[in-house]
From Swiss-Prot:
This is Chaperone protein DnaJ. GO terms for molecular function: ATP binding; heat shock protein binding; unfolded protein binding; zinc ion binding. It comes from Sinorhizobium medicae (strain WSM419) (Ensifer medicae). Its cofactor is Zn(2+). Signal peptide: none annotated. The lineage of its organism: Bacteria, Pseudomonadati, Pseudomonadota, Alphaproteobacteria, Hyphomicrobiales.
Length: 375
């Protein structure tokens, strides 16, 4: 009895496309023949993994498998009636009837070449790295063109042959009652070619799974959520087809002191009550490592902002710079000594409305408001 395809990949039946691809890559790296030379069981597992993924990654084939199981792909179960002869399975009919109606024909170029899949890589950087920019080295597990057969899938010294069933088109026509429907060629699988002597390294696929090290240029001023495209650095195409692209999705880690809004930075700085009252100065270290002095005038209130022009983030692909805003927070003294408490009580006694005009005016206005309501 054939093994369940979901069990083969080690995923749940509800697994999405991302989970399927992740499981496939992990298992393909583990059981690849290059990593297990002479191990027949590993080679068998590798083939089963490939077959399971090829079926489940295709929404139409997956729907057929979920409904009918392996019977959906057994050959010869639906009779003959397709131009060119040869047995065919339910999967072909399912694909033709529904795939053609819904525009589901797989795009192929001449010779069965297929474009490789696009890949996604998530990268996290610090705010300092986003400020200065950097060149990062990343390791990406992906399918690359087989260096033995150069992507043809055929053993060196041999070549793929034009499929005799479809004459190289990859499609054959089928009679379905009163209709004539075109379907994928059952002999070559739509490639238009057949390989009688496959490459021993890639087993006729034209590509192998390996890890590659790539350099990624992160420009100064890049923002959280930016996507960088590396053209042609995705999965290698099948049978010599063009490679897909690699997309780097960047996220900038939260900073301990700075918050970012576009090219501007904000920093909340706590100061003492006496500094806010009497005035003072302090230094802040900016992202470029330099220090900038902030002068606090006497009588500064909580929430006051001071602007340091040009001390924010670089504007992407520009010579302009954002600004840095210092937001004042006033820290109230805690755990006072007896002498400190006496001094503050004395200060309270000699204070006047002129010293605290906002609070004095507020309570006066509030009292007047409620007195008016009670009249």
């Amino acid at each position: 009895m054939k093994r369940d395809l979901y069990e083969t990949l080690g995923v749940q039946k509800s697994a999405d496309e991302k989970e399927l691809k992740s499981a496939f890559r992990k298992l393909a790296m583990k059981y690849h023949p290059d990593r297990n030379p002479g191990d027949n069981e590993a080679e068998k597992s590798f083939k089963e993994i490939n077959e399971a993924y090829e079926t489940l990654k295709d929404p139409q084939k997956r729907a057929a498998y979920d409904r009918y199981g392996h019977a959906a792909f057994e050959q010869g179960g639906m009779g003959n009636g397709f131009a060119g002869g040869g047995a065919h399975g339910f999967s072909d009919i399912f694909e033709d009837i529904f795939g053609e109606m819904m525009g589901g024909r797989q795009r192929r170029s001449s010779g069965g070449r297929e474009r490789g899949a696009d890949l996604r890589y998530n990268m996290e950087i610090s705010l300092e790295e986003a400020y200065s920019g950097k060149t990062a080295q990343i390791r990406v597990p992906t399918s690359i063109t087989c260096d033995v057969c150069t992507g043809t899938g055929a053993k060196p010294g041999t070549s793929p042959k034009t499929c005799g069933t479809c004459q190289g088109t990859g499609r054959v026509r089928a009679a379905q009652g009163f209709f004539s429907i075109e379907r994928t060629c059952p002999t070559c699988g739509g490639r238009g070619q057949t390989i009688t002597d496959p490459c021993t390294k890639c087993h006729g696929q034209g590509r192998v799974v390996e890890e590659r090290t790539l350099s990624v240029n992160i420009p100064a001023g890049i923002e959280d959520g930016t996507r960088i495209r590396l053209s042609g650095e995705g999965e290698a195409g099948l049978r010599g087809g063009p490679a897909g692209d690699l997309y780097i999705f960047l996220s900038v880690k939260p900073h301990e002191f700075y918050q970012r809004d576009g090219a501007d930075l904000y920093c909340a700085v706590p100061i003492s009550m006496t500094t806010a009252t009497l005035g003072g100065k302090f230094d802040v270290t900016t992202l470029d490592g330099t220090k900038s002095r902030v002068t606090v005038p006497e009588g500064t209130q909580a929430g006051k902002q001071f602007r340091l022009k040009g001390k924010g983030m670089p504007v992407l692909r520009s010579s302009q710079m954002g600004d840095l805003y210092i937001q004042i927070q006033i820290e109230t003294p805690q755990k006072l000594t007896k002498r400190q408490r006496e001094l503050l009580q004395e200060f309270e006694q000699i204070s006047s409305k002129e010293n605290n005009p906002e609070s004095a005016g507020f309570f006066s206005r509030m009292k007047g408001f409620f007195d008016t309501l009670s009249e």
